[in-house]
Amino acid sequence: MVNQPADMAAGTSVALLSSTYFGPVQWYQKLNRYGLCLLERHDHFVKQTYRNRCLIATTAGTQALTVPTEHSEEAKCSMTDIRVSDHGNWRHLHWNALLSAYGESPFFEYYADDLRPFFEQQWEHLFDFNLAITYKLCELLDIRPNLQLTDCYADAEALGADDFRDAIRPKKPIPDPSFVPTPYYQVYQQKHGFQPNLSILDLLFNEGNEAVFYL
């Protein structure tokens, strides 16, 4: 069990989160609003989740960008054991997808140089890759979450934490009354209507330094 941090004041709100690849607005809202966010290092890797995919808006609708992974043949693998695969030239494909989807958005060019390295450099482990992305996005969003990594699988009840590790997911998310998506400008809104809870990149590229006000 993760021990309660010694410097955590009584009554501090605690969120348990899984690792995400350019996670959704809802995930970053938790980072911004909770007094302490524990990022789970020891949960099992689950396919078709935000652990290795993000959702963006395109002219054809929502598109999933998925990072290919390598892991052992065991049925359940810890996130810390998941490796990033170089299969399929995915970095180039993901960057081109973002360029195609958001190249005409108000702030794509402003943030492009900060984000391009994630699609050029190689990372060995998915968790480390996602963590670096998270730190960079917090910097660009100008939020300073109290983010700590778990040293073993966390017991949400013992910590008095709100557990979002498997609640925030692309398919059949668990209802979250504390998250009410606030509409913001989107490039393809006239064609598809407002599409809520896409990757944080969608909010950043469309709203720039105003993005934090939607968190």
Region locations from a protein language model:
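Residues lining hydrophobic/aromatic ligand-binding pockets adjacent to catalytic sites
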Residues: 2-215
